[in-house]
């Protein structure tokens, strides 16, 4: 059996960096391990330059419909860019089943016309994979998609990639509290160190205020756009908060999973402070922390499929709760043995449930259902 694999990111760039050992396979949502489960993959040829949404949809449809290699199903990380193909499937003009990851809950539209169009659009999907049961439960409240098409997938990290990074750092004999991007002499207290990465829906004011009060060492990575005409809301939010000297703000540009993972691996705790959302904001950082065996302090997002407190791999804090963040940071800082155990439990959870090989196995099982 063979699938056509579509991704909103540049697949060829990802594969090239993977071959160089600088890109984790989980960003391809199990596609790299489908062959281990009896499914070959035709990789979508991503456009060389960024296109508008309409042009992307046209380009993708052209690539999918004119593919010379035989394939039995279409597997995608997102429906963005696939809209025309999905509509053709809904009309019965595209004969291959479509299996797609759905990143947000399906919601009912206020407009009757948009709701009717949405219900028709969702007929074009044969399987919708969600990151958590909460996303499925919320989606069932909107009568757009057939409940039988909704499933929960365990998206998780490329464990071998993070094990390789940890081995590299051990070989280089770099102390966990020594970060390449800062001068440790700037801080009287460089251990334990906390690290914040990611960009989606981050609540920088709450995080910075908590660390301003605690005086604990935070390395805060902020993704920026090099184009001066493009706003950088995350950076602007950080600058307005006036971080104290114990907070190192590091500006980064581009997709740098290997470089960032090396820095995360040197930290003692990963912090993920987000605004309230309807989706799994911060999940990429969560699975990375679990893979590296680090404790996590995270905003209490019910969409994320990890209950940190119950599973003992971290601490959850309510949205916008500065004092709650202070308490969590101080607990990790003053209970190093428990923090270490949290990290070990998180790694065990990654090995058992949240890893790329399990993700691929589940996806392969859903794809094979359409070969009968």
PLM regions and their residue ranges:
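Donor nucleotide-sugar binding/catalytic pocket of nucleotide-sugar-dependent glycosyltransferases
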Residues: 126-140, 145-164, 168, 174, ...
